Swiss-Prot record:
<dbReference type="GO" id="GO:0001068">
    <property type="term" value="F:transcription regulatory region RNA binding"/>
</dbReference>
<dbReference type="GO" id="GO:0071028">
    <property type="term" value="P:nuclear mRNA surveillance"/>
</dbReference>
<feature type="compositionally biased region" description="Low complexity">
    <location>
        <begin position="549"/>
        <end position="575"/>
    </location>
</feature>
<feature type="compositionally biased region" description="Basic and acidic residues">
    <location>
        <begin position="244"/>
        <end position="257"/>
    </location>
</feature>
<dbReference type="InterPro" id="IPR034894">
    <property type="entry name" value="Nrd1/Seb1_RRM"/>
</dbReference>
<comment type="function">
    <text>Plays a role in sequence-specific regulation of nuclear pre-mRNA abundance.</text>
</comment>
<dbReference type="GO" id="GO:0003729">
    <property type="term" value="F:mRNA binding"/>
</dbReference>
<feature type="domain" description="RRM">
    <location>
        <begin position="339"/>
        <end position="409"/>
    </location>
</feature>
<feature type="domain" description="CID">
    <location>
        <begin position="1"/>
        <end position="153"/>
    </location>
</feature>
<dbReference type="InterPro" id="IPR035979">
    <property type="entry name" value="RBD_domain_sf"/>
</dbReference>
<dbReference type="Pfam" id="PF00076">
    <property type="entry name" value="RRM_1"/>
</dbReference>
<dbReference type="GO" id="GO:0005634">
    <property type="term" value="C:nucleus"/>
</dbReference>
<feature type="modified residue" description="Phosphoserine">
    <location>
        <position position="265"/>
    </location>
</feature>
<dbReference type="Pfam" id="PF21380">
    <property type="entry name" value="Nrd1-Seb1_dom2"/>
</dbReference>
<feature type="modified residue" description="Phosphoserine">
    <location>
        <position position="263"/>
    </location>
</feature>
<dbReference type="InterPro" id="IPR008942">
    <property type="entry name" value="ENTH_VHS"/>
</dbReference>
<dbReference type="GO" id="GO:0042780">
    <property type="term" value="P:tRNA 3'-end processing"/>
</dbReference>
Length: 575
């Protein structure tokens, strides 16, 4: 009898949302979620009710209905992950409830987006990003909605025919991918390691290591491309910025998971996590669903805030790729302007979206790699122009504990001038993967122009797992150890902060004699300049510094190689 009364109370609470002006109430969502967790055995009834409510509620209440689905769905997801016995997909389990929601989520999202105003649409877009990172629903479902309703992932490449596209139907899409994988040859990593790798002679050890790198790159070149098998192209790989240690990030995430609450709904930004079932669902009215809320769990290969997006004109994050030429560079050298920022002094309760939010007035953030234990993060923004804007204008009043300086996201670390945020790189130090990313990256790079002496471009995106990067096998630069190395930015004895203002990209004083600019007609207009303005010079900030002597860290390079081999072996086992 008591159970019937409780269920009727759940139904009455759900119906009461219709009487609210906005259709949103944090306390009522908390009440529904608590009941749903306490009565998993009747999840079929509960899920059926919230699905029907989302379908039948007024247009102004569609967003609120998705918040209900979000709170209950992520609570069930967390229950499934924390309790191995609840992972079966049988009726009366959390997994079954999530699966039921997944079958209708595209329909509910399409209906809600079509009937919502612009403000609600933007909040639904944020929900998609939250679900993408938490793993609540399949990426293919969410990407289908993005393509259909937000036009975020539509490419300008008209050469692709219908037969080359994966079906949006999940079952058919899975069959196509599996069929494509079956046709792919298995990876064979039988590469012998030279005995000189363990030599005490640095010269022999370095030669042996380069021999292994050359063998690996030659091996990868001989592997047939997955995209050339059959007529179905696999989904595009995530473009992940390779700044930190993957194992370190995994350990950090495991420590976070071990102390997290059962609910996936987080506290408001910068607040301490609540404890106990009764208090773990904060009010939606308190910005629970704002873009700054730290309510997402980032996967190992998912540091991009908007994964799988393309740099196309209908994407709000579209940026041109400025390319120029600097005749003062040494022969066979290129210049790369960084888009990566090092953020120090990050509080322990600050998450990825919090960092993106505080920087948003100055730049749109593309990716974040956060190391809470060391209180720092590497943030990549979409353009050099935005990176300079952050360094020049962010936190000028010192109201936040955050410190910013240039970071390196591409190329050997010892080639970077950390004070001005650019690298002058000998072309022979670029790996094959570096060269590929430089010309084919979605953001940054040469936009297809060949790598030649003197070319200047913005830091390109890289793709982890597609080869060895020159940054990964380079030696780390200690802080405050050299003229062009990184500096701490902490207050010195006099109380001031030691820093050097960034040289504006394209507005730096020219060396004497001025460099001759070779601008090709196909050069694109830099982000932030009107089409009718003359293209600013993107020459050197000063006379080109002497080519840094190549430094060799055999341990770091060997570790990087072993990590890459382990990744390839894992991919082989999974396929």
């Amino acid at each position: 009898m008591q159970q019937d009364d409780d269920f009727q109370n759940f139904v009455a609470t759900l119906e009461s949302f219709k009487d609210l002006k906005s259709g949103i109430s944090g306390s009522r969502i908390k009440k529904l979620t608590t009941y749903a967790l306490d009565h998993i055995d009747i999840e079929s009834k509960i899920i059926s009710l919230i699905i029907d409510y989302s379908r039948l509620c007024p247009d102004s209440h569609k967003l609120g209905s998705l918040y209900i689905i979000d709170s209950i769905g992520r609570a069930y997801l967390d229950e499934t992950r924390s309790n191995s016995n609840s992972s079966s997909n049988k009726p009366g389990t959390c997994a079954h409830a999530i699966n039921t929601l997944g079958e209708v989520i595209q329909e509910l999202l399409s209906d809600a987006i079509a009937k919502s105003n612009q403000d609600h649409k933007e909040k639904i877009r944020m929900l998609l990003d939250i679900w993408d990172r938490s793993g609540l629903f399949q990426k293919s479902y969410l990407n289908a909605i993005r393509s259909k309703c937000f036009a975020m992932d539509i490419s300008n490449n008209t050469a692709n025919t219908a037969s080359q596209q994966l079906s949006l139907d999940p079952k058919q899409r899975s069959k196509q991918i599996l069929s494509n994988l079956k046709k792919s040859p298995p990876l064979n990593l039988n590469i012998s390691l030279p005995t000189d790798l363990t030599s005490t002679d640095p010269a022999k050890q370095q030669a042996a290591l380069f021999q292994v790198i050359a063998a690996l790159q030659k091996h990868f070149k001989t592997l047939p491309s997955h995209t050339s098998v059959g007529t179905v192209a696999p989904p595009q790989a995530h473009t992940i910025t390779e700044y930190g240690s993957r194992r370190e990030r995994e350990r950090e995430r495991e420590r976070y998971n071990s102390r997290r609450n059962r609910s996936r709904s987080p506290p408001a930004p910068f607040s301490q996590p609540s404890t106990g079932r009764k208090d773990r669902y904060p009010s939606v009215a308190q910005d629970q669903y704002s873009i700054g809320a730290p309510n997402t769990t980032f996967g190992t290969n998912n540091h991009h805030l908007y994964p799988d997006e393309l740099n196309v004109s209908n994407n709000p994050h579209y940026r041109p790729k400025p390319v120029s030429y600097d005749s003062t560079l040494p022969p066979d050298h290129i210049k790369v302007y960084s888009r990566t920022l090092f953020i120090g002094g990050v509080p322990l309760n600050m998450k990825e979206w919090d960092l993106a939010n505080v920087l948003k007035p100055f730049a749109e953030v593309q990716s974040v790699i956060l190391n809470n234990s060391r209180k720092h993060a590497f943030v990549k923004v979409y353009s050099r122009h935005e990176a300079e804007n952050v360094l020049q204008n962010f936190n000028k009043d010192g109201a936040l504990p955050l410190r910013t300086r240039w970071g390196v996201g591409f190329g050997p670390r010892d080639c970077c001038d950390y004070q001005h945020g650019y690298s002058i790189i000998p072309m022979h130090r670029l790996t094959d993967a570096d060269k590929k990313w430089s010309v084919s990256a979605q953001w940054g790079g040469t936009s297809g122009q060949p790598l030649v002496t003197g070319i200047v471009f913005e830091e390109p995106d890289i793709i982890v797992g597609e080869g060895v990067s020159s940054k990964a096998i380079s030696q780390k630069m200690p802080t405050d150890s050299g003229r062009n190395g990184p500096r701490s930015g902490k207050p010195n004895k006099s109380g001031s902060i030691s820093s050097i203002s960034p040289v504006p990209y394209g507005n730096a004083p020219l060396a004497s004699p001025p460099p001759q600019q070779y601008v090709q007609p196909m050069m694109q207009q830099p982000y932030g300049y009107a089409p009718n303005q003359p293209l600013p010079s993107q020459g050197p900030a000063a006379a080109a510094p002497p080519v840094p002597q190549q430094q060799f860290d055999p341990t770091a390079q060997l570790n990087s190689l072993m990590n890459m081999l382990n990744q390839q072996q894992q991919q082989q086992q999974q396929s």
